[in-house]
Amino acid sequence: MKEQYEQIAIQYHSEVLEKETEEILWGIVVDADKNLFQIDNIPFYGPELSCEDIVHAKYDEKAKRYQLVHIEQPSGNTTVQVMVLKEKYNREDLYNEILYAQTEIELVDDYYFVINVPAKTDYKNVYAILAALEEEQVISFAEPNLSPKHNADIRK
């Protein structure tokens, strides 16, 4: 059976943008009767939400799309927001180094991207790469949704 996708709107105050904002994410229908969806992309600026989280959403007739109600089941994934500080830095090398650590990336532009760190990935390796790049003032990063498992990884 082919997966069914729906748009899910999320409203929140973004610390990155410093304003109230709305972000549209894609969700795979998990249970249509219960309005449960699995988030299928990485939130760019958003709240404590990660790719693959199962969320409950209600359909908004006026907007003609679903609105997030709450997170039903966290995926255990971590979302990391990254700002590139160095203008003349090889972006491909940067992305490949992070991707090599078993992550996924979604780009906003040349200066901002988000990382999905799957639950099975050892975050200690990812964190070491990010911390080294931050120390070199290549990037600055934030962890708006650090899973308990990944928090424990960096404390090993």
Regions found by a protein language model. Give the residues of each.
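Extended boundary segments
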Residues: 1-19
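C-terminal effector modules of nucleic-acid-centric enzymes and ribosome-associated factors
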Residues: 85-156
